[in-house]
Amino acid sequence: MSYRELVVELAREHAEALSDALLELGALSVSVEDADADTPDEQPLFGEPGLVPDRTAWQRSRVIALLSPDHEPAVLLAAAVNDIGVTETPKFDVREVEEQDWVRLTQSQFEPIPIGERIWVVPSWHDAPDPDALILELDPGLAFGTGSHPTTRLCMEWLEQSVKPGQSVLDYGCGSGILAILARKCGANPVVGIDIDPQAVESARQNSERNHAEVTYGLPDACPAGEFDIVVANILSNPLKLMASMLASKVKPGGRIALSGVLARQADEVAAVYARYVDISVWREHEGWVCLAGTRRESH
């Protein structure tokens, strides 16, 4: 059985309403994209947490609806356009989508990832390329962090070089648990992972069990009192700035902190906020992202 995609380009003010109408009329799924994506006219839309976007769609939006074979695209679009009160049906394309083994297709897109000097992130359906390496078995899932994003890679490389056996580590914004698991495999103990998303916490627990890594996970209100030898936070620049005092207070005097989720152009601004508490600078840059690292001063 093959499916069809209905692709419609239209102005910003109608994109959301058309999406809702298509779903109500039986579309299996609907997505809205920037019609100018991958061109010089591409427009960033959503900001970081704590910042309110000023638009809900792009000036030139592309609405893509997945339809079952029993839906006639032109008829469905005409009905949707009528429902939202648009007088003229916009131009559209129809693309055939062949049925596939989606599980196998998805798995084929994720290969083992080498990171740093001896780390491999390996999906469960692959064998480890080097059995003697430091292996993290992780599958793509609901929580962020499989080693493919530059910020995750930067933090992993920093942890590999920085963690010493027996040190305590806090991974704030743990996502999949990848950084906490790596810290534990590097010899850190105890290791704590904190995230605001209960699904991420559960995912991280499962990943730790799969990797035989003893890590304590919880929501922010479960973050233990006291200080850690190492604190790592791979979030985004705005939350990092808002939490600077709290995160810095979790680092022992003389302890170390690493921050990522920060674009190179945001590095100075984030560093300036943390400079009250730690001596911090850009440790490494990769693909436009940076990892900031520093040491908490003994006087604070």
From Swiss-Prot:
GO MF annotations, alphabetized: protein-lysine N-methyltransferase activity
Xref: InterPro entries: Ribosomal_L11_MeTrfase_PrmA (IPR050078), Ribosomal_PrmA_MeTrfase (IPR004498), SAM-dependent_MTases_sf (IPR029063)
GO cellular component: cytosol
Amino acids binding S-adenosyl-L-methionine: T152, G173, D195, N234
Main location group: cytoplasm
Lineage: superkingdom: Bacteria
Keywords from the named record: Cytoplasm, Methyltransferase, S-adenosyl-L-methionine, Transferase
Any one GO BP annotation for this protein: methylation
Compartments where located: Cytoplasm
The keyword Iron belongs to this UniProt entry's keyword annotation: no
PANTHER family linked to this entry: ELECTRON TRANSFER FLAVOPROTEIN BETA SUBUNIT LYSINE METHYLTRANSFERASE
Family: Belongs to the methyltransferase superfamily. PrmA family.
NCBIfam families xrefs: prmA
Functional summary from the UniProt entry: Methylates ribosomal protein L11.
Protein name, entry field: Ribosomal protein L11 methyltransferase
